[in-house]
Amino acid sequence: PERLGIYQSVGDTAGPGGAMRALRTIPMYVEIAQAIRAYAPKAWVINYTNPMSLCVKTLYYVFPEIKAFGCCHEVFGTQKVLKGILEETMGLKDVKREDIQVNVLGINHFTWFDYASYKGIDLFPIYRKYTEEHKEDGYKEADKNWANSTFECAHIVKFDLFRKYGLIAAAGDRHLVEFMPGVG
């Protein structure tokens, strides 16, 4: 698509890449829903495949009584960013991502936190101050695992959106710009 002037940072949810992925994936999800209806109609289905919302919608279209929901790992990544900022700014050690409480809003790859706390500490003022102090250089991930390198970014788009809207964008910059052309 790029040679035609269509740019996509990821292409698994939105744009032509998302449409192509949906066309490839939906037929498989029809078969999955039929198999669940036939062999395990009481099972819960947890979907991590993209385009997530279309995959889950297909399951319900084929088998309306199915118990299914979709998840995205991006929320965990943003909890890790909050963990790192908390450790860096407050001098805390060994903060566990799982101990950061959040309220998640939105759709896959375009999720937001309107609440974030750690052991009773409201993280919004800490995050606000950090985004102001690091609006140019962003946040550098402490995780140097090569398997996570494709998700690495400085979170500058995330910081900018927080300053504009007052909510923490809970997806990586590469996904956020899919939904907001011209940002970043």
Q: Locations of the language-model features?
A:
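Generic detector of bulky aromatic hydrophobic side chains
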Residues: 1, 18, 24-27, 52-56, ...
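Rossmann-fold NAD(P)-binding glycine/threonine-rich loop
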Residues: 2-63
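Short C-terminal domain-edge/linker segments immediately following a structured domain
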Residues: 14-19, 76-80, 132-137
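Long, compositionally biased stretches enriched for glycine and/or charged residues
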Residues: 87-184
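A sequence-composition feature that detects small, non-aromatic residues
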Residues: 14, 19-22, 33-43, 68, ...
